[in-house]
Amino acid sequence: MQKAIRLNDGHVVTLGLLAQKDGTRKGYLSKRSADNPKWQTKWFALLQNLLFYFESDSSPRPSGLYLLEGSICKRAPSPKRGTSSKESGEKQQHYFTVNFSNDSQKTLELRTEDAKDCDEWVAAIARASYKILATEHEALMQKYLHLLQVVETEKTVAKQLRQQLEDGEVEIERLKTEVTITNLIKDNDRIQSSNKAGSADDEDSDIKKIKKVQSFLRGWLCRRKWKNIIQDYIRSPHADSMRKRNQVVFSMLEAEAEYVQQLHILVNNFLRPLRMAASSKKPPITHDDVSSIFLNSETIMFLHQIFYQGLKARISSWPTLVLADLFDILLPMLNIYQEFVRNHQYSLQILAHCKQNRDFDKLLKQYEAKPDCEERTLETFLTYPMFQIPRYILTLHELLAHTPHEHVERNSLDYAKSKLEELSRIMHDEVSETENIRKNLAIERMITEGCEILLDTSQTFVRQGSLMQMSLSEKSKSSRGRLGSLSTKKEGERQCFLFSKHLIICTRGSGGKLHLTKNGVISLIDCTLLDEPENLDDEAKGAGPEIEHLEFKIGVEPKDSLPFTVILVASTRQEKAAWTSDIIQCVDNIRCNGLMMNAFEENSKVTVPQMIKSDASLYCDDVDIRFSKTMNSCKVLQIRYASVERLLERLTDLRFLSIDFLNTFLHSYRVFTNAMVVLDKLINIYRKPMSAIPARSLELLFSSSHNAKLLYGDAPKSPRASRKFSSPPPLAIGTSSPSRRRKLSLNIPIITGGKALELASLGCSSDSYANIHSPISPFGKTTLDTGKLCMASSLPKTPEEIDVPATIPEKPGELSASRKHSSDVLKEESEDDQNHSDEDNTEVSPVKSPPTPKSFLNRTITEFPFFNYNNGILMTTCRDLVDNNRSTLSATSAFAIATAGANEGPSNKEVFRRMSLANTGFSSDQRNIDKEFVIRRAATNRVLNVLRHWVTKHTQDFDTDDTLKYRVICFLEEVMHDPDLLTQERKAAANIIRTLTLEETTEQHSMLEEVILMTEGVKTEPFENHPALEIAEQLTLLDHLVFKSIPYEEFFGQGWMKAEKYERTPYIMKTTKHFNHVSNFIASEIIRNEDISARASAIEKWVAVADICRCLHNYNAVLEITSSINRSAIFRLKKTWLKVSKQTKSLLDKLQKLVSSDGRFKNLRESLRNCDPPCVPYLGMYLTDLVFIEEGTPNYTEDGLVNFSKMRMISHIIREIRQFQQTTYKIDPQPKVIQYLLDESFMLDEESLYESSLLIEPKLPT
């Protein structure tokens, strides 16, 4: 039997009492159970899920207990009423039941008399489940946790809002301050009127202002957030790279548009009209010449029109720019450019030839006068395509610099750059080779009367400059006093152009055009330089201070007119030395070439031209040298690439010396070697003269029994004979005609250009053979030494001669002793070696001149009057030598006579012996010794010639290097102690030493440091106290002194663009700093004026200063002033510009057009060509040209050869720069004005200038 569940009675009683006291529901109810069907009234108390019932509400113990957990309480219907009276007398009852989940437990039935009370009990019992309470508790806990999270979030948001409010309050305060300030400035009148209105109106306006500020703040916050986003991207490296890349593309579009326009002018203004002219009845030009001049020009124009349209299409899709496919289109067409490049030199030659036709020249001038050409010549337009490919290369360099490595166009752009660089190297060589032709044609166009001799494409331009020409009467006046007034100087000023064959003397017209003077075209073969350096000290005592040591005379003896003398005066010693050196070298080259082409020894069939032609190293490319197809002034192919050793060999080759090669070498040797190497080479040539001539040429020179033609074969044909329109010509040398070759006799290397001191001073007599029997000139006498000399035969070199090092001897006299020792050795051995054959004489050491035979001892110099002597200078009738076809006088004999006339060492017997060598039948050994003598003299003259050019034109090399200066002086002193030295050679060496040791006075040329020192202690005066003329003059003086101080070696290697630019190019950086200082100074001077009228007056005055600078040819100052006025800080001052006069604005536009960078500064270049020095050009123009050359081609080829074509182009630019540097202004420094121009006390930087401009004229609200 199941036991009953035991309960703790005490605990139940306690709960019952608690239910009686704190129960949820209490009251009397009637209950009925299954055990007792009668209704019993009990007092019930509900405590949680326990239902207690008591007998009465005062019973101490409960009668029973029901556990309500899991039960169901609900209303029950009333039972059917009985018919008994007892039931009918009862009141209506309300029933409800409690059903338990356990089926064994019976339902509890309860009733109450009140329906409301019944519903409340049902509801209370229904809620008395612990499970329901636990569920509600869980739900409440979830709500509680959620509310806690919400509270925390709200706290964070509240904190952020409070921070934003604080920031907003600060910003509001700042904006209120700004708004207040703005309103005070702009709305002062309106604020005052609003203050007079009523309080109601004030309240409305304040509300409107608040709303406006609120709206402004909301918009400002949005804009600020968006601005931050934009600024973050703008400052990113990617955005910066893309921005620079876009700028490169936009610049490329502008340059391409300009280039297409240039090609359009070339085709429409020249090509097509000339085609029509060639089809006329009397054509001024043939169709073949038109095709040769304009080969592929029209095709190139069409190609670039397509390229330009494609580039515009790419720009229209900005910011997405895809360019690689454009260059892919261009690359297959490069063969068209290559044909144009190869034809470029030929086209200019054909053009120069056609311009000799007056009808064509007149027609061409009409075409060039069209407005579209803008005063540019046809040669200029033909050169534009040569610069386009290098411009593409620079653009591709910049694009690749700003293109990421992972960019899709990177590989394509790299490939395009490599292909264009290959063509660019060819183009640079062509431009270098044709520059001389274009220069000659440009000068010819500047001469109003024309100058046909400049249309000779074989002429080489050497130098130009402004010299003063004096007549003989003015010369005599100048020796008694000053030269004269400024007007007299201006009238005597001449613009001189030196070419390899002619000297052109012109005057400058008002429009910049040149006019030939009387006898202004001088053939150099008729000239003799009459400068006498040895008499300078005596002349200086009587000459005026203005022309002291600065004048030089040129004696001219034309063949078809009377002789005359030209007296020219340079502005400085250095300029005079440069002019005389170049004139001497040009005269020497042209005379010696003339002598070379004529007969001197009929007994020999070997000639110097044949000797040059037989030397394949002069025209055939080799591993260490490559040639162009252009010839230099000595009719030898120009060097394109060469090793350093081959360049030094060309410098010391005794057979010729081209003036253009010498100038280029001396300008650029620092790039590939140093001064000590050059000096060692010259010393070695002096000590070993035979090493200056190639062995094969020596063999030919000393060979008299072999036919050179049979030995070496025919020379190649002329390059022009096989020239085609679009193919490069073969490398070849022109030949002489058979009849001329038959007349040629044995010549010597000195006659081909190496003799620069004696033969350079030869004069050409206007008479012919009548001069042969003329007496000696009475102007000077020559004393001839009658000392005896021993005849010696040629022997191989002794070991002492072979191993002589090319260094300066430590002891005085060692050099001359070494040379004398070789002669003594030969003299002693000659008696035992009389039977040596000619084959043993291929290399001979320098020996002394052989003695004169006794049969000539009693003859006098008057029997040989073929040469004249004038003041100690030999005056030979070289034209008679050139024109005489039957002359039997050898070049060796002629040279011997010439040198003997100027030398006090050899006797007259030696002179007569040398003249008769050609006809007296002496042995070959004696003839070879005669040639050795000439070669030795040629070597000495070559060394002195190069040193003279080096010292006179490049003095800074010796001023900055004391060791080099000391070595040269020691070497020259040793040369002067040589007993075999001729008088003219000794004088030349003495002049070089005097030039090295002479300290130039700087009284007439104020240096920049001295000018700055003059301003110390000077009080700065305001701008209004200085006239515009004084400012312009002093600014020009400062600009010229800064520009003049730049040494030309700084122009090599782009040092101004390197990281160490201040160390490598300090003077170029100083010039740049000065330019920026003046530009900032002018802008600051304009901005500092608070009054509008004062600012307008300052602008007008500075424009007037710029115009005066233009008249002074100071184009650098013009650009300084115009660039400062065009700054944004000044250009935006619209109210100020309204006060500026129209005339000033028109003048400013004219000046800006003059110095504009359009077309590579074409207007500025034209002005520089049409002006006479002194002049200050814009340095940036030349630096741009140099960068263009440096970027286009390297200094060395892949084989390690020096790019000499590049050096030649850079040398030509430096030559133009030095032309402007050497001519100085005659302006006296004024310390007050200079102190004002150098004052930096009130200067502002770019940012401060713009801020001051905004204060003057604030930006208008948008």
UniProtKB/Swiss-Prot annotation:
Q: Where is this region: Disordered?
A: 714-738, 800-854
Give the GO biological process terms: neuron projection development; positive regulation of MAPK cascade; positive regulation of Rac protein signal transduction; positive regulation of Ras protein signal transduction; regulation of neuronal synaptic plasticity; regulation of Ras protein signal transduction; regulation of synaptic plasticity; response to endoplasmic reticulum stress
One family name in Pfam for this protein? RhoGEF
Q: Which top-level group of life is the source organism from? A: Eukaryota
Q: Keyword set for this entry?
A: Guanine-nucleotide releasing factor, Phosphoprotein, Repeat, Ubl conjugation
Q: Where is the PH domain?
A: 22-130, 460-588
| IQ domain boundaries | 208-233
Classification via Gene3D superfamilies: Dbl homology (DH) domain, Pleckstrin-homology domain (PH domain)/Phosphotyrosine-binding domain (PTB), Ras guanine-nucleotide exchange factors catalytic domain, Son of sevenless (SoS) protein Chain: S domain 1
Give the DH domain ranges.
Answer: 244-430
* Task of the protein: Promotes the exchange of Ras-bound GDP by GTP.
Protein name, UniProt field: Ras-specific guanine nucleotide-releasing factor 1
According to its UniProt entry, this protein's organism is Mus musculus (Mouse)
